[in-house]
C-alpha cells in the first residue's frame, strides 16, 4: 500500500532506514495531476529500484505572476489512487509552508541554460525548478531520478545541476508518452477546448515534418523552422510562441545543424500553453 508522507522529518527518517538497509531508491518529482507519462516513469523506477518514491508538490517558485499557480489542477486523492495502482511505495506531499516556512533566503540560478527557449519566455521559471529539485534531492536522496523528455530543457538543466553540485544521483530521461493521435500527455491538456484539442495534434505533426526534412538531408535551421512554423500557422489557431532548434544537451542555438539537436516549440491556446519537442541524435 502506498504511504502518504507530508513532513520532511518523516521522509528523512524513512530514507535513513532505507539507506541503512542498502535499498535502492528511485524518485519521480511531480506537481501532481498525474497522467500516463508520470505512470511510465513510475513503472521504470519500480523495475530498476527496490523502492519508488514520488513527490507531489506544486512549487510556487517556478510560476510567474501571470501564470496558472492558483488554477493548476490538484487532486491528491486521484493521484494517490494512480500511484497506488502501479505500486509506488511512498508519496511525499508536503505543504508550501512545510517546504518554505518563509521565503527562501537563498535561491539557485539556472544560468545560461535557462536564458533561452522556455527560460526566455518564463523568466525565473528554471531558477524555481532547480531550487525545489535541489531541495527534494537533499530530502529524498535517491539513487536514480526520472524526468520526462517532454520538458527537454528542464532535463538538460537538472542534469547539469546534478553534475555541478556533485549529487550522487543518476538522472534518467524518459521518452514522451503521447495520446493515440500524437499529442504529448500533459497536465495542462485539460484546459483545451474541444476545437483546440483537435488542433493540438498538429504540434506533433509539425515536429514530424521537421524531422522528415532533417532525415532528407536539410541542415539549415532557418528552413526547417520556417516550414514548421508555416505548418502550425495553417493548422492551428493558437499563438506560435516558439519554434527553435538547439544543440542538445548544450542548448546552443543552431544555424547549421551539425550534432545532436532538439527541435522545440510552444503554442499558446486560449487557456493552455503547450510545449513539445523531438530530440534528434547526431
From Swiss-Prot:
Report if keyword Ligase is assigned. yes
Principal location listed in the UniProt entry:
cytoplasm
Any single Gene Ontology cellular-component annotation: cytosol
Q: What is its EC number?
A: 6.3.2.1
Q: What is this protein called?
A: Pantothenate synthetase
Q: What's a BP term from Gene Ontology annotated to this protein? A: pantothenate biosynthetic process
Any one Gene Ontology molecular-function term assigned to this protein's record: ATP binding
Protein keywords: ATP-binding, Cytoplasm, Ligase, Nucleotide-binding, Pantothenate biosynthesis
Q: Which residues form the active site?
A: 38 (proton donor)
**Can you tell me which family this protein belongs to?**
Belongs to the pantothenate synthetase family.
Positions contributing to beta-alanine binding: 62
Amino acid at each position: 500500500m502506498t504511504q502518504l508522507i507530508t513532513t520532511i522529518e518523516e521522509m528523512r527518517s524513512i530514507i535513513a532506514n532505507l539507506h541503512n538497509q542498502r535499498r535502492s531508491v528511485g524518485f519521480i518529482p511531480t506537481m501532481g495531476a498525474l497522467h500516463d507519462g508520470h505512470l511510465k516513469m513510475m513503472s521504470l523506477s519500480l523495475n530498476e529500484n527496490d523502492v519508488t518514491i514520488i513527490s507531489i508538490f506544486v512549487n510556487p517558485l517556478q510560476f510567474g505572476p501571470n501564470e496558472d499557480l492558483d488554477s493548476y489542477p490538484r487532486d491528491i486523492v486521484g493521484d494517490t489512487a494512480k500511484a497506488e495502482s502501479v505500486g509506488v511505495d511512498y508519496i511525499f506531499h508536503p505543504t508550501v509552508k512545510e517546504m518554505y516556512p518563509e521565503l527562501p533566503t537563498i535561491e539557485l540560478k539556472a544560468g545560461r541554460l535557462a536564458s533561452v527557449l522556455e527560460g526566455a519566455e518564463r523568466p525565473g521559471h528554471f531558477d524555481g525548478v532547480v531550487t525545489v529539485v535541489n531541495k527534494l534531492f537533499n530530502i529524498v536522496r535517491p539513487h536514480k531520478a526520472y524526468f520526462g523528455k517532454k520538458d527537454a530543457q528542464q532535463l538538460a538543466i537538472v542534469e547539469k545541476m546534478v553534475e555541478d553540485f556533485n549529487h550522487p544521483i543518476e538522472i534518467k530521461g524518459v521518452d514522451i508518452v503521447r495520446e493515440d493521435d500524437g499529442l504529448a500527455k500533459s497536465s495542462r491538456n485539460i484546459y483545451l477546448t474541444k476545437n483546440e484539442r483537435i488542433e493540438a495534434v498538429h504540434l506533433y505533426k509539425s515536429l514530424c515534418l521537421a524531422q522528415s526534412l532533417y532525415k532528407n538531408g536539410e541542415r539549415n535551421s532557418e528552413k526547417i523552422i520556417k516550414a514548421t512554423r508555416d505548418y502550425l500557422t495553417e493548422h492551428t489557431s493558437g499563438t506560435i510562441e516558439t519554434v527553435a532548434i538547439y544543440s542538445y544537451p548544450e542548448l546552443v542555438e543552431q544555424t547549421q545543424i551539425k550534432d545532436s539537436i532538439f527541435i522545440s516549440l510552444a503554442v499558446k491556446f486560449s487557456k493552455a500553453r503547450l510545449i513539445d519537442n523531438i530530440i534528434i541524435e547526431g
